[in-house]
Amino acid sequence: MRAVLLTLACATALTAGCSRESAPAPAAPAAHPAAAVQTPSRSHDESSYAEPDKVVIKDLALDLAVDFDQKILSGTATYALEWKDKAAKQLVLDTRDLSVEKVEGQAASGAWAPLTFQLATADKVFGSKLSIDSPEQNKLVRITYKTSPTASGLQWLEPAMTEGKQLPFMFSQSQAIHARSWVPLQDTPSVRFTYSAHVTSRPDVMVLMSADNDPAAPRDGDYSFKMPQPIPSYLLAIAAGDLNFKAIGARSGVWAEPAMVDRAAKEFEDTEKMIDVAEALYGPYRWGRYDMLVLPPSFPFGGMENPRLTFATPTVITGDKSLVSLIAHELAHSWSGNLVTNASWKDIWLNEGFTTYVQDRITESLYGKEMAEMERQIDQTELLAEVKDMAPADQALALPPLNNRDPDESLSQVAYVKGAWFLKFLEERFGRETFDPFLRSWFDDHAFQSATTDQFVAYMKKNLLPKAPNAVTEAELNAWLNEPGIPKFAMKAQSRGFSNTDTARIAWLGSGQLPNAQVTNEWVTQQWVNFIGGMGDKLSVEQLAQLDKAYHFTGTPNGEIAMRWYPLTIRSGYLEARPEIAKFIERVGRRKLIMPIYAELVKTPDGLAFAEESFARAKPGYHPITTASVEALLARAKAGQTP
């Protein structure tokens, strides 16, 4: 998952299908859920109730119906289980706001019989523990259930909230722990399973999943999917809407609403080249196809690396490819994250730091070293600003146990930028001729597995450090992994491409003379970001008006510029921007782009009132994850806790 040019943390199933007919259950009283019990403590993974040391899901089959009227998914989930502990008698799953109708187990005879289950009292962060009694250690268990209309991992959009405004839209966001809100699962990245699915819907929408989507499949309301590679639960994904497909290359293409699909295909036309670059560096792409789905602007993140079907925000479609590093990032996850996965969310840097580093390498290869350097410098500058307000423990790559913290809220730029900076440090110390083969071997040796920071450190000490024994000290490794902040010996990115923007800004601030249009016409998004970002805390209204007249920042369709320009106007009292600010935060639900604007607004009473009014209008179109973030910010502001 990636927020391009990140400034705030972004933080996004099934065997050959379960049979619609089953053998009659033996004569016995129907099992009913026991009374709700208190939420028990969690072990193994602080964010999951699952007990994978006792029993693990190996394959999952979904048979679901999409109901746009009720805004629910309903049906069955069938689990193929591997029992590891011969004494275990329970299957424990994670759920959130699910209605469980019944649970059945298949006996050795093939007959299905009801199983007793208990659904614990819900925890506000982790949901409800579902305990299923299985005294015979059933190899197949089936749950009949339905989701809530307010499931945190699903968003339902009315036609008016889509590009085409004709058909409704639904999509999921399972990372970090939202898969449990639409499928009962061992919702931990330490468990991987293959899956298949049968999904029915209204016949005028196309349904897609993080699986083998067929571009030629008829739009008939009846769809089947299969994912033969094992994935963790957070990569389970589904979407349904008015979607068309356009091929980009032999194994890549774009799904989008009809009005968007051509623009998206043009913007992402280098995707096949990106795959080639990544394969040359880190080995074969192991997921078959790499397709992308462009979602409505309410999608709360920049992208989500769902295997075979990356979910992407339309806010990166600028017409000049200046933000396609998002696709490089999500593609890079095909090695770092999807192939080798953090074992728990406290090790998230193994996903996001590695991916940001691989993204930089792809960007450098296709768009030049200068582009990669500009993006690194922006990321590093913003990380250094962010850590000033962070607790020291949160600034380490190797995080302490999250305990009761929501992993969505514990994610910061540290995992992305400090993680990538650390790998860049290793690359510089050992040289690419040594570091590139090492990183490839890490991916190869841990393919389709989950890993911890301790495992990576042990692997590095065995396979990298001996190649140049004096290149890195234990103290330096400890500074990167376990100490707060950025080590003083870290080399900072320095982009030559920012020299003109810095010079132009300094000259304008001193003389009021804007740079020549022939110069600024050549600037890419990253240079405009640097130009605005160096303006300081405030400008005069007259200065902002001059910039606006020349560059039309107010009302810009470029989210990376908007998220920096609008906070500057708010701090400076430039009220002329307010109408466009309202339009922007009511149209876009991507947290990275709108949270800095809300955070600036709530610092004053009139700004807080404006934010509340805008949010009230925007909320029906926001994703539940975005809604929760804004509501928490507004609540803190009203309590006197301004950002």
Regions found by a protein language model. Give the residues of each.
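Short, glycine- and charge-enriched coil/turn segments that flank and shape catalytic ligand pockets
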Residues: 85-87, 106-113, 136-138, 215-222, ...
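Hydrophobic pocket-lining residues within nucleotide cofactor-binding pockets
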Residues: 98, 230, 316-317, 570
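Mature, folded catalytic cores of secreted/periplasmic enzymes
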Residues: 48-56, 61-65, 69-71, 78-80, ...
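Short, solvent-exposed secondary-structure capping/transition elements
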Residues: 153, 434-435, 574-579
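Long, ordered, helix-rich scaffold segments
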Residues: 412-414, 418-419, 446-452, 464-643
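Acidic/His-enriched low-complexity segments
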Residues: 18-288, 430
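Hydrophobic alpha-helical and helix-loop surface patches within well-folded domains
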Residues: 21-31, 100, 225, 254-505
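Gram-negative bacterial Sec-dependent N-terminal signal peptides
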Residues: 2-19
